[in-house]
Amino acid sequence: MRPLFQLGPRLALCAGFVREGTVLCDVGTDHAYLPIWLLKTGKISRALACDIRPGPLETARKDGAKYEAGEGLSFRLSDGLRQVSPEEAKDVVIAGMGGELILRIVEETPWLRDPGKRLVLQPMSSVPELRLGLAEAGFQVLE
C-alpha cells in the first residue's frame, strides 16, 4: 500500500471542519486529495468527488485508485452541485474557487439550507462578498 500523503494547510483546515462519520461531497475536487485523505484516515466512510471538467475528474479517479480509497469514494461530473441529490451529502466542501462562484453554487442549491447540512467553504478571493451573500441568504457563518 502506498503511504498516505499529508494535506497542505488549506485542505487540512477544511478537513478539520468536516464532521466525523459524515457523507462528504467535495465540489471542484481536482485531485480528490481531501476525500481520499478523510476516507483513509477513517474520519468518513463515504465521499462523492465532483468536478466540472472531465480531465480533473479522471485525475481524481486515478488518485483514488493509487491511494486505494476503495468503494467509499465515487466520482461525478457536475457543474457545482447540479448533479448531486440531497441524500448524497451531509457535509459539502467547496474549496479553492472564487467567492462569487462559491456563492453561485450555494444559491442555486436549495437543499443546502437544510439544517442538517454543513458547508465548508474556502474561497480564494472575494471573501467579504461571499460572507455578505451568505448572510443575506440566511446562512450562519461560523469562521
Language-model region placement:
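S-adenosyl-L-methionine
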Residues: 1-22, 36, 58-87
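Conserved SAM-binding loop of SAM-dependent methyltransferases across substrates and taxa
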Residues: 31-44
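Conserved class I S-adenosyl-L-methionine
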Residues: 21-30
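Conserved SAM/SAH-binding beta-strand->alpha-helix loop
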Residues: 53-55
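Short SAM/SAH-binding signature in class I
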Residues: 89-96
